[in-house]
Amino acid sequence: MTQTLSQLENSGAFIERHIGPDAAQQQEMLNAVGAQSLNALTGQIVPKDIQLATPPQVGAPATEYAALAELKAIASRNKRFTSYIGMGYTAVQLPPVILRNMLENPGWYTAYTPYQPEVSQGRLEALLNFQQVTLDLTGLDMASASLLDEATAAAEAMAMAKRVSKLKNANRFFVASDVHPQTLDVVRTRAETFGFEVIVDDAQKVLDHQDVFGVLLQQVGTTGEIHDYTALISELKSRKIVVSVAADIMALVLLTAPGKQGADIVFGSAQRFGVPMGYGGPHAAFFAAKDEYKRSMPGRIIGVSKDAAGNTALRMAMQTREQHIRREKANSNICTSQVLLANIASLYAVYHGPVGLKRIANRIHRLTDILAAGLQQKGLKLRHAHYFDTLCVEVADKEGVLARAEAAEINLRSDILNAVGITLDETTTRENVMQLFSVLLGDNHGLDIDTLDKDVAHDSRSIQPAMLRDDEILTHPVFNRYHSETEMMRYMHSLERKDLALNQAMIPLGSCTMKLNAAAEMIPITWPEFAELHPFCPPEQAEGYQQMIAQLADWLVKLTGYDAVCMQPNSGAQGEYAGLLAIRHYHESRNEGHRDICLIPASAHGTNPASAHMAGMQVVVVACDKNGNIDLADLRAKAEQAGDNLSCIMVTYPSTHGVYEETIREVCEVVHQFGGQVYLDGANMNAQVGITSPGFIGADVSHLNLHKTFCIPHGGGGPGMGPIGVKAHLAPFVPGHSVVQIEGMLTRQGAVSAAPFGSASILPISWMYIRMMGAEGLKKASQVAILNANYIASRLQDAFPVLYTGRDGRVAHECILDIRPLKEETGISELDIAKRLIDYGFHAPTMSFPVAGTLMVEPTESESKVELDRFIDAMLAIRAEIDQVKAGVWPLEDNPLVNAPHIQSELVAEWAHPYSREVAVFPAGVADKYWPTVKRLDDVYGDRNLFCSCVPISEYQ
């Protein structure tokens, strides 16, 4: 045997698991594209002046088992105290049936945002259920399908209040003094760029302030007080002031709906509905508003529509409000939301139903009443008489109480003057309450739970009678039908089967990087050491998180060529916003706050102009030449014209057109020459890692989509993470946090997310990916992504011309297929091809972005040659079908393309088409058949007949 022990140990085994094509397949594809090796191919494609001489030093690869053991040892450094800190975060009990069948199920977590509704009906139904939960609990008319977290939802509510306000000259936003501090932090950050003045005061003093366009109230207040705001809201409405309420979703099960009290906007975190704290996220926010404001709402909204056969079908409604269409005029820059987490919360409500939720909420409240009664019996004073789950307890010996709590491995809220905060939750037991008595009163308190229970059961006054809900919630059958585990399991499976995810087929969406989310990467997110930590626990309890985050940040610094990384932004769009804020504050620190012009190429992703607008910048578009590259002459002219007002350029690399622009360094130099900064959008980082880097190219700041390049799954539309890398001069200007000091960051800036490290509990996914791939594997992943894209382009270019190529006719990691000539010639559109691909078992590529009338294909490195060939064969077969239409064999108005997709019921219905049933549903001998459950959606009907809540069960049958 000639192999060494090191070879037999095969520490790089995961690289071969992650990368789809094996060595033989790679060589076949290299031969097909006319390249000798991966190095030769990337050497030809990537401009010489930006190629790294050696890959970034992020270490050797580790096996799945070694990496898991290493991360487990790090996780064990976290201390799992029982946290009663509250402040919008509580421990939960995630039902195992949801844990196993959704959170740990690739059929749910590997799907993409449901832009293609025909292959997304399952998660769209779950999201519609989420909207129904929101509507029932808030008492409002229109709900979104989730926002990023409660604090960013508050910022969106403020922006929306200004959009809909009739007080056009008012420029002040009032925040009640008992709003969560992290929410106030994010609101202040957003208000600064919008030019709003934020006033913080007791809610009852709001009427003392002039020129207020909007008000933010908290129900329940951050220290636990239940407010009856009915009269105040009525007075505010009489003055045309828009009222927003941040609400606790579990408290709303028992309390009067804020919408019923007159609130215009209600939002909050859905974390309490089954989603672990995870050191801050990811969690879904809910958001609702009055019907009259629906077209000003931020984020995704699921609506009920019809398909081509007239059957009920679901889709994302009113997309013309959103960044991918309206760009800088969009309501927000939201792209990723929190679909997976919203669906967990939605199914938590389905599983428990109204009876179960009321039992949980009443039990939490009863234990809180018992705790309050015992403390008051022993002479302690409560700051608030009315509460749901949170007590603000005044204590003389605060240090002693906190010391006893620490000794008992308990966290209390400690930032309240002369008092401690205690928030109970669904995991709290009577034993926990007895332990709290001992911490606050000493061991000899002599209190008895059962005796206290009898007292409070007959005489609880902690919720005002006027604040008790008197209407029914969750009356729709979906919330009253699936309470046995068998029924719940089957319901979830029925939803999953309606959708197309990576566990069934390649999802070749350009600009989306739908790569493998390996099981070994996903396992740590459910470890209790990561899942159960409160984001505001003492830092010495989170040493494992700190070590993991520091290591990940160090690796990302090396991979990007930057000097520092901030982990706070909890989506790519948030990363863009944070990066642009860093640029803005950098200019202000140099007394150049007048620099507010942001140059953006015409090809840019829609979030770029939307984020620039949010950051208070003016967008100036830079033209692209006939080859899809930035027009350097136009760039120079626009930069010179902007002069001392130039703030930055936002550029994507490789370009959104799928090529490595030769002049990227010159682009950076031109912008720097005029005093601007270079923001390099990290959307296409999967074609850079190990080959080049933003810092090496000459950029100053980038966001990284960890849910693209670094393997966090898309979750059907979230979660995502968008940390930013910055050069040293921008490091002081990255987001900070008002509650938690971020170790190693000398920043005094405001927050952009509720938690200091954003969605911290999904960072282990990226840690695992980098650790298992190592420097060698990461570079190879980028190279194979480029090879796969060029293989597809070379094999399809005769049937579907590739719109843009770089030198030698190559593309980067994705390619744009130009459908416009075919459409002009035959009448068949890119939409028809996209829908026909469903019949072949594929999710469509990205349609009409960045160029109308095109399909953008990104295969990623994870797809094998077998799957690539299957896709190519499907596309070639579709081209042959188009030729049949062109030849007149099938009429333009009745052929397999315009009628696609085809569903099972059509097989047994009367068949009057000029093509066979077999051609319709088993084209080209498709073996592993995916069946869509609806035909093509009628988008016009959906927006003209907007309906965004649950429909009768019979409509689905």
From Swiss-Prot:
One of its GO terms (molecular function) is pyridoxal phosphate binding. GO terms for cellular component: cytosol; glycine cleavage complex. CDD domains: GDC-P. It comes from the Bacteria. Its EC number is 1.4.4.2. Keywords: Oxidoreductase, Pyridoxal phosphate. One of its GO terms (biological process) is glycine decarboxylation via glycine cleavage system. It is an enzyme of class 1 (oxidoreductase). Its cofactor is pyridoxal 5'-phosphate. The modification N6-(pyridoxal phosphate)lysine is found at residue 708. It catalyses: N(6)-[(R)-lipoyl]-L-lysyl-[glycine-cleavage complex H protein] + glycine + H(+) = N(6)-[(R)-S(8)-aminomethyldihydrolipoyl]-L-lysyl-[glycine-cleavage complex H protein] + CO2. It holds the Pfam family GcvP2_C. InterPro entries: GcvP, GDC-P_C, GDC-P_N, GDC_P, PyrdxlP-dep_Trfase, PyrdxlP-dep_Trfase_major, PyrdxlP-dep_Trfase_small. NCBIfam families: gcvP, PRK04366.1. HAMAP family: GcvP. Belongs to the GcvP family. The glycine cleavage system is composed of four proteins: P, T, L and H. This is Glycine dehydrogenase (decarboxylating). It comes from Escherichia coli (strain SMS-3-5 / SECEC). The gene is gcvP.
